[in-house]
Amino acid sequence: MPRRSILSATERESLLALPDAKDELIRHYTFNETDLSVIRQRRGAANRLGFAVQLCYLRFPGTFLGVDEPPFPPLLRMVAAQLKMPVESWSEYGQREQTRREHLVELQTVFGFKPFTMSHYRQAVHTLTELALQTDKGIVLASALVENLRRQSIILPAMNAIERASAEAITRANRRIYAALTDSLLSPHRQRLDELLKRKDGSKVTWLAWLRQSPAKPNSRHMLEHIERLKSWQALDLPAGIERQVHQNRLLKIAREGGQMTPADLAKFEVQRRYATLVALAIEGMATVTDEIIDLHDRIIGKLFNAAKNKHQQQFQASGKAINDKVRMYGRIGQALIEAKQSGSDPFAAIEAVMPWDTFAASVTEAQTLARPADFDFLHHIGESYATLRRYAPQFLGVLKLRAAPAAKGVLDAIDMLRGMNSDSARKVPADAPTAFIKPRWAKLVLTDDGIDRRYYELCALSELKNALRSGDVWVQGSRQFKDFDEYLVPVEKFATLKLASELPLAVATDCDQYLHDRLELLEAQLATVNRMASANDLPDAIITTASGLKITPLDAAVPDAAQAMIDQTAMLLPHLKITELLMEVDEWTGFTRHFTHLKTSDTAKDKTLLLTTILADAINLGLTKMAESCPGTTYAKLSWLQAWHIRDETYSTALAELVNAQFRQPFAGNWGDGTTSSSDGQNFRTGSKAESTGHINPKYGSSPGRTFYTHISDQYAPFSAKVVNVGIRDSTYVLDGLLYHESDLRIEEHYTDTAGFTDHVFGLMHLLGFRFAPRIRDLGETKLFIPKGDAAYDALKPMISSDRLNIKQIRAHWDEILRLATSIKQGTVTASLMLRKLGSYPRQNGLAVALRELGRIERTLFILDWLQSVELRRRVHAGLNKGEARNALARAVFFYRLGEIRDRSFEQQRYRASGLNLVTAAIVLWNTVYLERATSALRGNGTALDDTLLQYLSPLGWEHINLTGDYLWRSSAKVGAGKFRPLRPLPPA
């Protein structure tokens, strides 16, 4: 029987925790007439109250209250109120043990409660084993068991029995998983897997370590090296379909555990477990390398296009002076010809008066040389980089197993033909080669008088392949990011069942006719209202004219003088402390470090200061090596080991949720909002040193490569989500991820972004998923309104109404596809960002992409109409975005080492940097909130009058009182006792 504990003390308490919210108490503990009739049959007030309380405990949480266990006070008060008797009667209950036993027997008889038996235990283990095939999280299994027992009215056993059943289920599931991954392996498979643990020829690393290395710079040499990695993975030739034998969560967990092991550690594993771990590593490694190869190709193509654009611009600029001279010269000649016509003189003589005829004739020849064709384009410069692509293209096309949707069949046909040419060493493209995929822009380069140009044909095919992979029209066997679009979605059968049962997890009517009727009726009403207000010049702080379009008066963002004085006063009271002291104090309040559990054992970190040191190394961008030097008593080896086993995306996420929830529960945070609105924004960090090649360039941030940390922040200043994204991808791609996949208790209803955060697709999905979307759109007057029919009724809005009309037929035709997509995103079958990237990359004619865009246009138009009518909406959005920008300033101050540059080549390490930074800024926000409340109380206690309406101007984002630099010591200079706080700084003399 497994002995290892799989639940923490906090998790054990949570399983039997009683509700304290009033609505939950009412839901669980309200008696009906039958209940009251049975209760009233007891003799004496104490017995009636005790019997009723025991009934409540048996129903929820499912236990029987022991002799020495006092009842939960809110529950006792509620029961006593229903029975109309004093709570003091409880003290007289159950003085005889026999009374309690009799009550338990009667409760079982009357209400059908059953004791937990060995038969139930065996059934529980059997049931939980099926769940354990999906997850080995102890709390998930134990919670499922407890809920199942409650549904069956089975009295919960002791907690160690629940934990033992869950642990046994995990052990059984592990055996089944190992068997599923190894039973089909033959002797050659096992021999090839064993080779992974041996040292690579001529190298100091094992084959496994080499295969798991990330690619370096996006160039042909590194591409070829990575292709060799994929070929090595493929050479294992694992049994077909083996990756589908095990749930993805468990496969990832086994692979992650194996990735932290040394070859010596893996060799010590029991045989079946060792081969299962190596198979999991191979499956995940193959998918990762496949995706990385496609990403490398995407980035190489992007670099070549950028280089061609730059060369094109440089050449044009270089000829700029000559072109200008010619324009000025022809201006003089033109003026001379005009004067000659007016005077009736000889035009040729007029030209020769400006310059000799031979010089004029030569200038015409020069002008023809300088002139560019009407379809002036940089694309011809791509041909100069053909050799770069040619170095890896044959291997690239040969190693990927591609499939295509009908829309991309032409691209795949061209790829197949290129593969054949590569294998036959053919140089000339056949005259009957596929050409339907060639866009007009490429046609003039590819299709020449001498036939098909091989160089541009291959460049065009590889470029179009990149686009088709992005959109999902072409997918790759063995990939995670580039699968068939349909594979990402909820299965059609499951979707149909959910829709039929009216159980789709969406916030809208799922009947298309009803939905469109309601939204279009609202749209027409809003259009009429705003048109009337615009005609009467009644729009608040806004005006629409035919001549100048929409003009909106900017908001006054000044902070009242009284509020500024309060900000200054409270800032002077906040205690000075080190960042290490702040983190220790916040951990004392929240226990967030307990969430950084061991990957294998789920134990908490034994050395909390070592864990905090590792987190801080991420947050301040110092890295483990330098942090070990700055933190006495710490070594790199210790920090590296702790990071490998305790620091993961999910542990950072749950720890962050702990801090966000603590901020949500702070009464003082209510001055800034109720936790139902949020904003998101991207913050650019340059990539340097080894990480420079992993960065992307966005002209918005200059010419240096970088990464974006995309962060969501609540109206209470809590940063509840952070994600590392490419600077070249629009912010809107990631807006929904933060709203859907955070783990905090926040229930966001309204969300704000800047212009980069919106697209019509995002507007549509936001509405379907139950969020009110409110972006601050730059140049709003140029953002058109969309209506379903003629604009004659809306004369005042004509400058803003698009000439295109809403395509309602397209929405109707693809309604079920829209619902299925939204359902898949809501249920977590696929991330919103992945789907939005693919939809944004689709060709214009794709039905689903167009239908979702049209639905989004309805919602965008409704939003703009609201914006025109409501100054309050504009203020909310402005205030929300200002909070995000202020939080970015704090993040920049914390992330100050290494010049604020990201220098980690590994994307995993870059994610840890972002997560550590977000966690520490959340801790600073919480600490500041607690002490701002104490500071305002101190000011009031000193006789200072504070206006409650001005408290909203205080901000928990200050860091002037926090020492972020120096040696990182974890011994507090001012020890704070449990439940106590640091003294504020003295109040300044009046």
Swiss-Prot record:
Pfam families in UniProt: DDE_Tnp_Tn3, DUF4158
Biased composition (Polar residues): 674-696
Coiled-coil zones: none
GO biological process: DNA transposition
Cross-referenced InterPro entries: DUF4158, Tn3-like_transpos, Tn3_Tnp_DDE_dom
Region (Disordered): 673-698
Domain of life: Bacteria
GO MF annotations in UniProt: DNA binding; transposase activity
Keyword tRNA processing attributed: no
Signal peptide: none
Transmembrane segments: none
This protein's record includes keyword DNA-binding: yes
UniProt family annotation: Belongs to the transposase 7 family.
Cited function: Required for transposition of transposon Tn3926.
Name of the protein in its database record: Transposase for transposon Tn3926
Lineage: Bacteria, Pseudomonadati, Pseudomonadota, Gammaproteobacteria, Enterobacterales
